[in-house]
Amino acid sequence: MDYCLLLEMAVNLGYELAMAGAETYRVEESIRRVLLTYDLESEVFAIPNCIIVSIETPEGKPMTRMRRVGQHGNDLDAVEWFSSLSRAICNRRPEPKEGISWLTKVNAMRKTYSLGASLLGNFLAAAGFGLFFGGTMADTLWAGILGVMVGLTSHFFASIKTNPFFTTITASFLMAFSAYALSALGLTDSADAAIMGTVMLLVPGLLFTNAMRDIIYGDTNSGVNRIMQVFLVAAGIALGTASAWNTAEMVFGTPADQYILSYSGTIQVLAAAVGCIGFTFVFNVHGHGAPLCILGGALTWAAYLLVTYWGGNDFVANFWAALFAGFFAETMARIRKCPAISYLVISLLPLIPGGGIYRAVNFAVRGNMTMFADTAIHTAAVAGILAVGILMASTSVRLVNLWKTQHK
């Protein structure tokens, strides 16, 4: 057997998973299982920007392969495809050359949305969450249009390979300044609602979720790496929106505090569902998985509202809703034999504190440092509570699976 080709096949599979946005443990476990199928023990080390794999052939010859992982996106469909390929290789044990051919075919077969469809997703995501955060119909429409602006900005900078931090700052500035300009012209009722809805497109939901799951599975280096990326993106959003507020103040005068509407639970759940529909385009979800992701997002917010109805505070409601989202994702993953991350990311979106990030920045630029500190601490605490909910759901499922394995 050509062990060089075998190692190349395994590393390339891990690389494709990493580029699609898979968790570190999934990348490492997929490589390890593929090599074990060929009776090879391996040492696999992966972090978000690098994969290193070492094996020893039956003749005692050590071999190591390293591959750098560049900037990667949010392609949940690719995570499903390559996870399925990993299982197929483990079940059928093809020759390495044939396995590499399978990898090439999967790359050619997997689907991606066109730019137009992606922009439609941006519109729906921003519009849905604009309504979710209490905007009027006018705010919702403008949030959708600003979402398209963010999509075009991100697409342009990605095409010229600009640093993501700069892209986030620029997109945040253009979006927020446009919202303040629309408010000054009397075209929106609440620039804040439109901005909060659109900011959800920039909030690193997949990064945050993967960071928590990496830490859960003991991949602390990767988890901390991703958490730092989350902080950088949040800082980029803060810099962009703060600069937009200051610029708008010079051009139009101080942006007024605007009233945010309070909708019924039913409308909030429907708005969350619309936002999640948009994110199925943003995260490249196809087929039967898309409606299940949307259902997960709607039910997660319904769970949040139910806990608050029973008297739970914001932290308690976020914990139970995150726990529900975790169990929902794990259940769907086992029913459909797909990675749980495909369902968890979108199911969690209504809980991701994008609005909290914007409110904290807004208080800071207005000089209300007491409210800034309170809101920033609350937002960080919510993120921590979500992590605990995800941790408990994932750990519970792993313990149940371990018990079943031991008692077969």
Located regions from the model:
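Soluble N-terminal domains of membrane-associated systems
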Residues: M1-S101, N107
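Short helix-coil transition sites and intra-membrane helix breaks within transmembrane domains
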Residues: G21, L202-G205, P353-G354
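Alpha-helical transmembrane segments and their membrane-interface boundaries
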Residues: G73-F327, T331-L344, A360-K408
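Juxtamembrane non-transmembrane "cap" segments at the membrane-aqueous interface
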Residues: V345-G356
